[in-house]
């Protein structure tokens, strides 16, 4: 599907200011002192995540985001090769391997071919879940991996043998985040994300993949979801988005330049892959694959392309994003200095 994200930009009308006229009377009486005219207040941009911020309301530098409509193993390889220049040494691939028989996860043959042709020796990495499901324990997790066909390469459950605390620079909730301990075994990280909706996060892009997916199942995920509330799911909306971003920042800072981000916009249910076969039916059309060295740019471009869909085809996913204040992920990543929300698209199909 050819998607024109530029069409979503509103026409901005600039109002002219009319100066007040004044002067002395015929008797040359002193003119009354003029009061300084109040200038119209600049429109405030709502950054709480409940409203979409169009591109013409954003500012700052631009990053490069690559795009292909080719939803196939070859399309994935083609776009990966544009953002892999700093992927060296021992490579981890963070993706959502899904609950048993989950219908929407990234096709295993695509990942198998990518590893065989472009990242030989790479390891898929995951962590155990916070909720009590098929992947709550390491044993159950490994059984689920077999059921879902992730058997063609090593899969490292990062928190299988413990945790490690990574610093969070500039966080307002965290000074450090608890991660799966094996994260320190790897030199580079490929963030391979199935972009979709999410019950709590509004949407799940590269940020959510790392924020929840790299935090260990017992401590780190609880820090994000519950904090000090005493309730398993006590944190929501803006604060939840901000906590996710701070968790992600720990991973992004840890790998430095040796990290890259790929979002696959396919089978985009409003439900996360955590919901497995219970996921809501897909109503949003497939779009393609996006990739960047900038995590904010790739997630922002993914969101922009959903908003650019015509005839209300993105309605369900957009409603999910806005009702959960999920767009706060983007504005807080910008506030945390994690990337740019402006970008240039390089269309690999042209």
Where are each of the predicted segments found?
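Bacterial N-terminal signal peptides that target proteins for export
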Residues: 1-9
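Bacterial N-terminal signal peptides
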Residues: 10-19
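N-terminal and secondary-structure boundary signal
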Residues: 21-350
């Amino acid at each position: 599907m050819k998607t024109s994200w530029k069409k979503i930009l509103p026409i901005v009308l600039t109002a002219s200011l009319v100066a007040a006229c004044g002067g002395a009377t015929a008797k040359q009486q002193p003119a009354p002192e003029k009061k300084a005219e109040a200038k119209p207040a600049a429109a405030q941009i709502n950054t709480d995540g409940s409203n979409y911020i169009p591109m013409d309301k954003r500012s700052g530098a631009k990053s490069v985001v690559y795009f292909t409509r080719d939803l196939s193993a070859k399309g994935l390889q083609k776009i990966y090769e544009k953002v892999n220049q700093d992927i060296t040494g021992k490579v981890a691939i963070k993706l959502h391997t899904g609950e048993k028989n989950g219908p929407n996860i990234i096709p295993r043959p695509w990942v198998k071919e990518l590893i065989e042709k472009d990242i030989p020796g790479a390891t898929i990495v995951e962590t155990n879940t916070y909720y009590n499901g098929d992947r709550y324990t390491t044993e159950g997790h490994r059984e689920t991996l077999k059921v879902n066909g992730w058997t063609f390469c090593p899969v490292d459950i990062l928190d299988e043998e413990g945790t490690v605390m990574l610093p969070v620079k500039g966080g307002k909730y965290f000074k450090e985040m608890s991660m799966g301990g094996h994260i320190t075994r790897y030199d580079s990280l490929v963030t391979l994300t199935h972009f979709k909706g999410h019950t709590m996060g509004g949407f799940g892009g590269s940020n959510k993949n790392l924020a929840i997916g790299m935090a260990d199942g017992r401590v780190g995920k609880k820090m994000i979801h519950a904090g000090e509330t005493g309730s398993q799911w006590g944190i929501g909306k803006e604060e939840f988005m901000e906590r996710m971003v701070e968790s992600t920042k720990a991973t992004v800072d840890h790998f430095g330049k040796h990290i890259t981000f790929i979002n696959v916009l396919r089978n985009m249910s409003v439900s996360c892959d955590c919901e497995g076969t219970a996921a809501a039916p897909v109503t949003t059309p497939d779009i393609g694959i996006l990739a960047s060295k900038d995590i904010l740019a790739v997630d922002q471009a993914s969101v922009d392309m959903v908003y650019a869909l015509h005839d209300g085809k993105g309605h369900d996913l957009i409603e999910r994003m806005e009702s959960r204040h999920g767009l706060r992920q983007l504005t807080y990543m910008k506030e945390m200095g994690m990337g740019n929300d402006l970008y240039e698209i390089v269309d690999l199909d042209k």
